Amino acid sequence: MPVTQNRIPGTALDSKTILERIRFHLRYSIGVRKEDATPYALFKAFALAVRQELLDLHHATQERYRESQTKRVYYLSLEFLIGRSLENNLIALDLYDIFAEAAREWGIELSEIANTEPDAALGNGGLGRLAACFLDSMATLGVPGFGYGINYEYGLFRQQIRRGYQVEMPDHWRMEDSPWQVEMSRDALYIPVYGRVEDGVDRDGNYNPMWMEWRILVGVPYDMPVIGYGAKTVNYLRLYTASSTACAAGPRCRRSAHRRRAPAPTAARRR
């Protein structure tokens, strides 16, 4: 059953308040002045101001879910084609015009800021678009639905044309930290992988096989708020990044080699 939701009034904020938020995040969250800010830094300041609103609504949504003790839906997918989030979130919040006014008061256009945002390279096919639509629809309808996937480091590829031929380059879409992703390190998962089974006996002479030379894969989750159009409901998309590994046994050089290979599950390019 969908949880009852309220619509968000678009007049909850004014351009002055929003501009103060943007200035705060640019100066203190990012650590630069406007005069020294890159286009991406400006985008990030705007995005953090929007995320502030999203997280307030997200906490209210979670409290509503807890009080109603409603069942939850978890959607697992290898791909989530969510596109660019700044304009989508502003439209869903009914705050686009106010943010555009704040941007003009600062001497810039919101459309220029929005075009700085890279597409979230979390897939390359219909599977990812379908998954993103499901999350958006569930949030719009007030359904407690959450997505789980992989936080890929690279996209499909970045195209260059050299001497009339296509050259494929790595798509480092996460070269800069995403302002939409909130690291949830307290929920990290430690997964033992690889290794071998060695026969053995315990002190009583009973057969006791041991798992040897295994490695630990650390999955660190990052949550992205997912808001439905015009709704108060904000769910999340949880994406896991392979952070590091450690070898349970063996020389230090072997552990270092394993550690270098650690990000492979999330660094794989989507083809």
Language model features with spans:
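A conserved ligand/cofactor-binding region detector
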Residues: 1-271
